[in-house]
Amino acid sequence: MAKRDYYEILGVSKTAEEREIKKAYKRLAMKYHPDRNQGDKEAEAKFKEIKEAYEVLTDAQKRAAYDQYGHAAFEQGGMGGGFNGGADFSDIFGDVFGDIFGGGRGRQRAARGADLRYNMDLTLEEAVRGVTKEIRIPTLEECDVCHGSGAKAGTQPQTCPTCHGSGQVQMRQGFFAVQQTCPHCQGRGTLIKDPCHKCHGHGRVEKSKTLSVKIPAGVDTGDRIRLAGEGEAGEHGAPAGDLYVQVQVKQHPIFEREGNNLYCEVPINFAMAALGGEIEVPTLDGRVMLKVPSETQTGKLFRMRGKGVKSVRGGAQGDLLCRVVVETPVGLSEKQKQLLKDLQESFGGPTGEKNSPRSKSFFDGVKKFFDDLTR
């Protein structure tokens, strides 16, 4: 049976960094470890497969060979010859076989810094009006002693003796030769003989930094703000990554947001619903009076234009929609109960056609339903 791709086994991309590979291995190894799956032959085989993939992909030389030749690189006779740091043969065949096998004569560039993500919780008011907030994030910053070179102060990285600074080595097999990343310097073309005492040759140190982030008015949950160059510092002077601030708007006790519109429920008593009147309602800009017409039914929506959220992209301003909820009175006194009884009598009972047309229609429908059943 053909062996599975090592990258596929670990669930990582072919450009994955070593820390991504280690993280994937740790997760899968814990899941399929024999101690946690005693007697499970399938899990045992899976664990061996994961371990094999990890051992190859975390070894720079083995990984480079695997990327070039696949599983054939580790079969007997799969790779002959050895490493050669010269450049003459590459001048003849490099353009042809470099393209075919993914090699190339250029030195591998130092890795750009990783992007970072920060989850920011905002109140609805902050999201609507905009706000400036200070955040503190852990990150990797350029070492201030070696200025990112990784070398001890007063020294410089030295040219790699294996690849002579090209970052590439040649694998010979018979008449043909292919290039791959130098396993000695990992493609950088230089080596650090005396590492910096502070960053230990990495060119970066762990730090926390404080940033002032300006949140524009109108943002909503799911919006993302990019701060260029505020991610982790790049390796050995490479560009820094970016910081992405992910917005999450907290639930509001009064308003619900849908796009640029706001919704709220406005409770009114049945007397106001029947007779009409004015009631004070909240908006994000303060209190305003809402005119309720007579004979208003529960669920009726009243639109207050321009009282919603201004679009984060400018221009459009949303509305505030007030949904009326007619409340049934509670805690009635005997006098109030009698007044309601008298009122109900004046309606002609609970199904009064004139004053409760929907009730009349409903009960007429119920009567017809049962009449049809008894026929």
Curated annotation (Swiss-Prot):
Cofactor(s) required, per the database record: Zn(2+)
Induction: By heat shock.
MF (Gene Ontology): ATP binding; heat shock protein binding; unfolded protein binding; zinc ion binding
The UniProt record lists the keyword Chaperone: yes
Matching CDD domains: DnaJ, DnaJ_C, DnaJ_zf
Keyword annotations of the record: Chaperone, Cytoplasm, DNA replication, Metal-binding, Repeat, Stress response, Zinc, Zinc-finger
UniProt remark on cofactor binding: Binds 2 Zn(2+) ions per monomer.
Main location: cytoplasm
Gene3D superfamilies assigned: DnaJ domain, Heat shock protein DnaJ, cysteine-rich domain, Urease metallochaperone UreE, N-terminal domain
Listed GO CC annotations: cytoplasm
Function as written in the Swiss-Prot or TrEMBL entry: Participates actively in the response to hyperosmotic and heat shock by preventing the aggregation of stress-denatured proteins and by disaggregating proteins, also in an autonomous, DnaK-independent fashion. Unfolded proteins bind initially to DnaJ; upon interaction with the DnaJ-bound protein, DnaK hydrolyzes its bound ATP, resulting in the formation of a stable complex. GrpE releases ADP from DnaK; ATP binding to DnaK triggers the release of the substrate protein, thus completing the reaction cycle.
Quaternary structure (record): Homodimer.
Entry's free-text remark on domains: The J domain is necessary and sufficient to stimulate DnaK ATPase activity. Zinc center 1 plays an important role in the autonomous, DnaK-independent chaperone activity of DnaJ. Zinc center 2 is essential for interaction with DnaK and for DnaJ activity.
Protein name listed in UniProt: Chaperone protein DnaJ
